[in-house]
Amino acid sequence: MKTELIKLHLTLLCVLISFLSFSQVKLPTKPKTSTFEVINSNLGLPKVNIPNSNLLNNQPNGMNVYEQDRRRVAQQKNELKKIYAELNTDRINYSLPSYGNIESTKHYRKAFEQLAEMKTDSFSIKKATFIIENAYFEEKQNYAEFEKVVKQTGNFLREKMEELGYDQNRNLAKNFMLFQFFSDTLQIKSKNLKHLPFKYDFEDYLGIKDWSQMFVSKLLATGKGQCNSLPRLYLILAEEIGAEAFLSLSPNHSYIKFKDEEENWYNVELTNGMFTTESMILQSGFIKSEALQSGIYMQQMTEKQLLSQLYSDFAQGYARKFGYDPFVKKVIDKALELYPNSITANMMNSNYLTIQFEYVAKQVGINPRDRKDLQNIRNFPNIVKLLNNVNSQYNKVDDLGFEFMSAEAYQNWLASLKQTKQKQDSDEMKKQFNIKLKKTFKN
């Protein structure tokens, strides 16, 4: 390598010597300062405008950029949801699934047809009650046996009235006899027949575990009942002996009203075997003025309204046995057709519409119980209509004067009916009835 560098050096030296020897070239002179041209430092470069401080302050900061991105993403999500809504609108099922494929539901459909054949202003509550309960038991009950028990009881009541010397043409006499049948021990000495009073059944009195706890057939079999079965049997027996009596409602409760020949009205509380004053019923604290104005509480029901109540009970039995489906809605609509202000039917309609709305909302991925998520239904006009229907129905229930009464409050109110003052008032009424009936017998 060193040898090659020496050779290269010698070659360059020889070339330089030959150049100097054979060419007359002037040696370069020292340049003067004045000969240099001033060069523009920006020559060939783009001109850049430097912004002032005010412009810099107006530029978006990191938080503003984040907010803009967040809004843009949210808008994109909403647009996607709208597209999704348009694509899936035709796939939404707006009706609750039917339980009609269950074999035992046929008994309810048959029972509905039987109830629909009844005249609204004149029907047999005995027959209607059997139809309703028999549907729940899948038509395994025997109407002839049920009718036999009712007739035998009717005969017992008539014989007892005759033994006591009551005028069986008087409505007061017949209702007082019915009251004693439910609340006292009765005997017919000539035939050695004895009847014990019915008792209030505190076990599952709302029928939550077993809906048949609410039935008249259960009351007749066990001698125990509650505020649904006791008044129902009273009306059945009143029908049997030709007494005029009416069903009336108060919060979570039903009782009997009847009037005597002087147009005086009386309240029969069968859960404790007493006559009850209007003031005692009002003392529950859950009867608002709106409820009295709308007539949902403390008013005697007409035949048409009573049939509506039976339809509501019928729908409740189906819903407890199977669940809410379009058949329940069909029955509720019939009940509301007969009695638009029925608080029982309106409450059931509220339940149905709520369940229907939640079912539809979940189909499009919306949690109906999440307020934030619920806002997304605006992309589904038909679902918005369902929600509006729910709210309208809730408003109607409120306008009728409904106020929720807890099970504890209800039990406390029932207990208050047994207080000394209430018992004294009831005993005084019984004395007055006996006096009136004895005077009639003497005449």
Where are these regions (language model features)?
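Bacterial Sec-dependent N-terminal signal peptides
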Residues: 1-31
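A structural boundary/capping signal
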Residues: 24-443
